[in-house]
Amino acid sequence: RSPERLDIMMRNRVEEARRMGMPLLIGEWGAFYGDARCVGAAAMMARFLAENTVGEFYWDYHRGIEQGAFFPSLSRPSPLRVGGFPVGIRMAESPGVMQVEWTEETAPAPASEFHLPDGWVMEEAPSGGKWTGAGTVSVPPAEKPGMRKVTLRPAS
């Protein structure tokens, strides 16, 4: 587990995407193969990916992957769409809290949607937030343009 090495690698990819004016998508990462020694590395990588990319694909499939010690790093919340301009995504390694901020510049803005895996909740549900099924929560736009923020966390 080398946070400095991973930080340099991610910083280089983020800078490259900015230079090209493109979103950053990580095509493939992973293959921890159920190794419990990889829990820290998986959590660190998941945090870097959540904060710096528009998406990624984890590569590894074997029976019982859900029982792998690193699986909580894969089964995490994610913004599916935000009704405005994304400002920031922060994912704490422990206890696994995700915060998503965005600016709604028009009124009414489109609704924002977030994927919540089993066992996750929206901490401060903006008024009118509702479950739409299949682990998705919908957050309606605010009445006036401005900064929005939601916190997603494991249920107590």
Where are these regions (language model features)?
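Short beta-strand segments within Ig-like beta-sandwich modules, predominantly Fibronectin type-III
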Residues: 129-133
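Short strand-edge motifs at loop-to-beta-strand transitions and within beta-strands
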Residues: 135-137
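Aromatic-rich peripheral "rim/lid" segments of glycoside hydrolase catalytic domains that contact
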Residues: 36-128, 139-155
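Extracellular glycoside hydrolase catalytic/binding regions
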Residues: 1-52
